[in-house]
Amino acid sequence: MMRRPHGQAAMPMSGPRYNEFIQSPRVRVIDENGENLGVMYTRQAMEQAQEVGLDLVEVSPNADPPVAKFLDVGKYKYEAQKKANLARKTQKTQEIKEIKLRPNIDQHDYDTKMKKIVQFLEDGDKVKVTLRFRGREMAHGQLGMQVMQRVQADTQEIAKVEQHPRMEGRQMLMVVAPK
């Protein structure tokens, strides 16, 4: 059996303090119906909570005096965990989607790529438009700029340009974000 070195504290408790773990000598007590019972000694409040068959849970430790409520600890922790999971689930992380184009793109291909860009923007994602130059196409940088300006014009109602077109090696990049 492993023993804790002399003088070291026990493992810190996760979650709210309850019953004998409440360190404050006096607490403001709220019963199971939400009624304020006033400020009383922690021991007295714990006894009242046990009479009702509940625990005394510290819900606001930073208040003066701390606020404690008559609750079922297991149920309280479960509800808090459920609330945290729901908040994490509903939180939308904004992703950067990438669409690759060519300087000499045909109209139908362009329309297909534009539909995808619009779909990404409506979903709330940023879109990185990459225009790749091959071989001698590098000599015709203005063609790439025209395609980028066309994308910019076609998305101006639903998006704003976050990063204007710029060359990076053999490719031209632009980032558009939803408005």
Curated annotation (Swiss-Prot):
One of its GO terms (biological process) is ribosome disassembly. GO terms for cellular component: cytosol; membrane. Keywords: Cytoplasm, Initiation factor, Protein biosynthesis. One of its GO terms (molecular function) is translation initiation factor activity. Pfam families: IF3_C (PF00707), IF3_N (PF05198). It is found in: Cytoplasm. Its main location: cytoplasm. InterPro entries: T_IF-3_C_sf (IPR036788), T_IF-3_N_sf (IPR036787), Translation_initiation_fac_3 (IPR001288), Translation_initiation_fac_3_C (IPR019815), Translation_initiation_fac_3_N (IPR019814). HAMAP family: IF_3 (MF_00080). Monomer. IF-3 binds to the 30S ribosomal subunit and shifts the equilibrium between 70S ribosomes and their 50S and 30S subunits in favor of the free subunits, thus enhancing the availability of 30S subunits on which protein synthesis initiation begins. Belongs to the IF-3 family. This is Translation initiation factor IF-3.
